[in-house]
Amino acid sequence: MLISFIVPAYNEEVMLGATLRTLCASARTLAEPFEVIVVNDASSDATARTAQASGVSVLEVDLHQISAVRNAGARSAKGELLVFVDADTLVPEETLRGMLAAVQGGAVGGGARVHFDGHGVRAWTRWLAELGCWMMYRLSVAGGCFLFARRTAFEAAGGFDERYFASEEIHLRLALGKLGRFAMLPAAVITSGRKLRLFSAGQILRQMLRLAVRGLPAVRRRDGLDFWYNGRREATDVRPPLKGG
């Protein structure tokens, strides 16, 4: 079974190299053929060169909408299993082994636990973020940083809904759940805590309250979604290295 790893990226030169090294090292332990596609969304830095230096495929787009970027990667992919991994997310080999076992066991898709790197994050901010991730896991909602689906199920579900500029992974998860079993893996991925460092607690709370009050209309426009779309990046990668990374 060919596995396609799809990595959307916008100005990710700092973190992308370690993400790809770790992902490829983990994928090689599966003894399954795989491809990695970095979907470069009009980056102004060395994202494309970093991806090319890692020996993976690069798809150039100019979309500025994460659902559309992921869908573009899916259309370009050749695999029977589509795996969406954010450019700031490290995927351990045990997580990929769990994913493969779930799919071979009949799951149409799934996700994993999500942990933040936690470096330089205020303790209570990290606690709230981890609580949110735990609640999503308990509710079987996969984070967009790591989500997998059989191609047949992904296409039957309509892919990521491009009416939305955020929360698109939740809508896809609900659609996949109507087609079969959605597996939440006990293993985890490690994603960057940069948003917890680059945004104040007040900014994060205001963003969450805005979404809670306005609901779906709030995520149908890019305006007001600075938490996801303002493009802030850190100068160094502080994520702890994993095996192969």
Locate each region found by the language model.
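Conserved donor NDP-sugar-binding/catalytic core segment of glycosyltransferases
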Residues: 93-121
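Short, well-formed alpha-helical segments that are part of the catalytic scaffolds
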Residues: 12-27
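A conserved acidic beta->alpha catalytic loop
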Residues: 22, 40-48, 89
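Glycine-rich, basic loop-to-helix element that forms the pyrophosphate-binding segment
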Residues: 61-77
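Short aromatic/hydrophobic "clamp" motif used to bind/position activated sugar donors
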Residues: 82
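Acidic donor-binding loop at a coil-to-helix junction in glycosyltransferase catalytic cores
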Residues: 166-172
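Acidic donor-binding/catalytic loop of UDP-sugar-dependent glycosyltransferases
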Residues: 46, 85-101, 174
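Cell-envelope/extracellular polymer assembly enzymes that use nucleotide-activated donors
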Residues: 2-4, 35, 171
